[in-house]
Amino acid sequence: MKGGMAGLMKQAQQMQEKMAKMQEELANAEVTGKAGGDMVTVVMTGRHDIKRVSIDPSLLEGVSEDDREVLEDLFAAAVNDAVRKIESNSQEKMSGMTAGMQLPPGMKLPF
């Protein structure tokens, strides 16, 4: 019985390590979303960070290249700000439910 418990603990530890590695891989993955026939493109990480926004110049006729780039950066910053606020709100609301639970570092609820 003692050996079985040790084996079970070892399996649990290995599973936790694999989960942490998978969470890191998912967090670092990048996906691209497109709209309007590829006229607007957004690149986002698994951490929900907007890395890049591209707006086709034809959508912003009369706007300089520099102003278009500023608009793209501001859009990315605004979305990132909204995502952080949602995450903070979710974490705050869930903290009451998870009080006393021992979750691995970095693990967020809901899963």
Swiss-Prot record:
Q: What is this protein called?
A: Nucleoid-associated protein PFL_1905
The principal localisation class reads cytoplasm
Annotated keywords? Cytoplasm, DNA-binding
One GO MF term? DNA binding
Q: Name one GO cellular component term.
A: cytosol
Q: Which Pfam families match?
A: YbaB_DNA_bd (PF02575)
- Keyword DNA-binding in annotation: yes
Tell where it localizes. Cytoplasm, Nucleoid
Query: Species name for this entry?
Result: Pseudomonas fluorescens (strain ATCC BAA-477 / NRRL B-23932 / Pf-5)
Q: How does it assemble?
A: Homodimer.
Identify its protein family.
Answer: Belongs to the YbaB/EbfC family.
